[in-house]
């Protein structure tokens, strides 16, 4: 299957090609057709499997098809952390580069003056963290009457971080007629319970992780004093002459890019690999 199967508008297909992608991932293959049919979706897949593009791409297609001009936001994407919200923003900008789509991000740590300026203009997509979004709503800076799609990204993290009460208040401020999408790395009873509160007859999609064990992997735990100590210890291990290749996992895409740059300048032949590439 190729991305052309989804019959995206040429502008979206062009952005996908420019990003170097040729074939959708399993979560994208199953989620995109359902979202394009305006269905509620509850989807689960491991981190790094293309979950963000699984909802961003069909959302952009639906926005492109809808020519009605409203103040917006027409799409509301809620993420548990500032960093994850910024990653979604990067993805939206990448795939919407050839479309006339307006997006903005409001997260904690940004000045209210800047965010108020962003919200003063018509918006197609708003990406936000729960606390700041609820705060701006209470101030009357944003309304959800035009919101047609609402995405809850990393739902399991939202549960862990105690954001459900905020999400509930935000949801209750909408028309409750919007298409609801919920994406999560895990799909346990607590996530399913929250989904039953916000989603109506959702299509449930679960991509099972590869859990095969490997007996030839040795595991060790090292304690470090700080970030600098961790970096130096990592470089010490990588300098081992018996080591030919290594794979280093980071928590976020930005950390992967930063570590790649640091190791490159320390004379290690290094390359990053993540979902934005």
Role assignments for model-derived ranges:
Residues 2-277:
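Conserved helicase RecA-like core
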């Amino acid at each position: 299957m190729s991305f052309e199967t989804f019959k995206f508008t040429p502008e979206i297909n062009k952005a996908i090609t420019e990003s170097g992608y040729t074939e959708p991932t399993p979560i994208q293959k199953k989620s995109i057709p359902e979202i394009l049919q305006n269905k509620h979706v509850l989807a689960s897949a491991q981190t790094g499997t293309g979950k963000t593009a699984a909802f961003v791409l069909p959302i952009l297609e639906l926005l492109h098809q809808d020519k009605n001009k409203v103040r917006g936001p027409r799409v509301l994407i809620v993420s548990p952390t500032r960093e994850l919200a910024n990653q979604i923003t990067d993805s939206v900008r990448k795939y919407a580069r050839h479309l006339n789509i307006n997006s903005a991000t409001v997260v904690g740590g940004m000045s209210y003056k800047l965010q108020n300026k962003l919200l003063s203009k018509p918006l197609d997509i708003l990406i936000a963290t729960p606390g700041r979004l609820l705060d701006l709503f209470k101030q009357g800076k944003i309304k959800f009457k035009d919101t047609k799609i609402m995405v809850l990204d990393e739902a399991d993290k939202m549960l862990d971080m105690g954001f459900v009460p905020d999400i509930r208040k935000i949801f209750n401020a909408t028309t409750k007629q919007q298409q609801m999408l919920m994406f999560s790395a895990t799909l346990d009873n607590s996530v399913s319970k929250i989904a039953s509160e916000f989603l109506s007859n959702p299509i449930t999609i679960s991509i099972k992780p590869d859990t095969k064990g490997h007996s030839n992997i040795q595991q060790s735990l090292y304690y470090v004093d700080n970030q600098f100590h961790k970096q130096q210890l990592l470089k010490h291990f990588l300098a081992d002459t018996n080591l030919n290749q290594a794979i280093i996992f980071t928590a976020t895409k930005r950390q992967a890019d930063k570590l790649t740059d640091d190791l490159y300048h320390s004379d290690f032949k290094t390359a990053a690999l993540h979902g934005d590439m």
